[in-house]
Amino acid sequence: MLDALQNAFFQTGDTLTSWLSAFSSFLWGWPLLIMLLGTHLYLTAILRFPQRYLLKALKLYFVKDHTDKGDISPFSSLMVALAANIGAGNIIGVGVAIAAGGPGAVFWCWLTGVLGMATRYSEGLLAIKYRVENKDGNMSGGPMFVLERGLNSKWLGTAFAVFTAMAAFGIGNLTQGNAAAEQLHHAFSIPSWGTAAVLTALTALVMLGGIQGIARVCAFFVPFMAVIYILGCLYILTVQAEYIFPAIRYILDCAFTGEAAAGGAAGAAVMAAMRTGVARGLFSNEAGLGSAAIASAAAQNRNPVRQALISSSGPFWDTVIICALTGIVLTTSIIAHPDISCTDGPRLTTLAFSKIPYIGSPLLTLSLVTFVVSTILG
């Protein structure tokens, strides 16, 4: 009886896995790629390439006006959004993308980040324009308010809120927490239940402070850990400097001529690189997902354009810098060690960071866990 139940359980699990895999392949096929990249390109064109205002956006980080309505500073709102964006996907996820779609996926991920800046600009602008002030004086906003107040479609706004909450549990919590648990178990043999308990306690402690408490934690951890992680990547690239330009050329070749990590025909390999790269870009910077605009709505900023510029810089840090650095680091490691298979994303990432003497593995673990915690909070 027990064996029959066990076999039925595994068969159900295999069926569910196959169904989810087929659905994922359909979802990330040509229609969604065209719609997502098409939206990025369309907004880039009609807004006359807002990416060119990146330096102005960076300067606005330090402009603060406490007379503006809002709950947190514009810089803190960006840090909360980046906290939700910069997570396991920027570290382990890039390795998984390379394993699935080859090094060419790094280019498509990077391109999605650059073009996605226009979409995040639009999301930030609409978040400020259609936000509302609650009875307690706090600001609420996001795509659900844009859909309800801008398009006069309450049911669509409600549907967006429900599906966003569901996605938050999946890509925002379960995936991130699992990545941290696996890394801590691999590095320090910490049981998964212990990691889950600590993450739950930390999250509850910070969330008791409301949006201000979350913003304070994110405003400290996100820049601090991003700088440490970037310095670690730069060290690895310095050690493997002779492979940097070959790695970039390899990424570009794989993006257009097609050379998937697992092999296959050229056309299928290009499609795999595009699909995994664009998916990783969306998973990383959320440009087009809409959830990052919820944090933008809480900013002390009455000028929608100013907040839109600040919001648009998010994909730059998240995808153009961190994801691209990770991708180049991993590709240099592939070229430097051709005997090592690149079909195992997590192992490839661990190998790359082993180039940092003494602190390579702890640095990778610390970066991953910190980014995971900030993602769950964001």
Residue ranges and their predicted role:
Residues 35-42, 46-59, 179-184, 191-252:
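Membrane-interface loop-to-helix entry segments
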Residues 123-130, 232-250, 262-264, 298-301, ...:
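Extracellular/periplasmic helix-exit of transmembrane alpha-helices
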Residues 68-100, 126-144, 148-150, 162-165, ...:
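Alpha-helical membrane segments and immediately flanking helix-loop junctions
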Residues 1-88, 98-105, 116:
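N-terminal alpha-helical transmembrane segments of multi-pass membrane transport
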Residues 33-38, 73-81, 153-167, 197-198, ...:
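Select transmembrane alpha-helical segments in multipass membrane proteins
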Residues 49-74, 96-106, 110, 118-151, ...:
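Flexible loop linkers connecting adjacent transmembrane helices
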Residues 39, 43-44, 112-137, 143-207, ...:
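Helix-loop-helix module between adjacent transmembrane segments
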Residues 115-123, 197-211, 222-242, 275, ...:
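Selective recognition of specific alpha-helical transmembrane segments in multi-pass small-molecule
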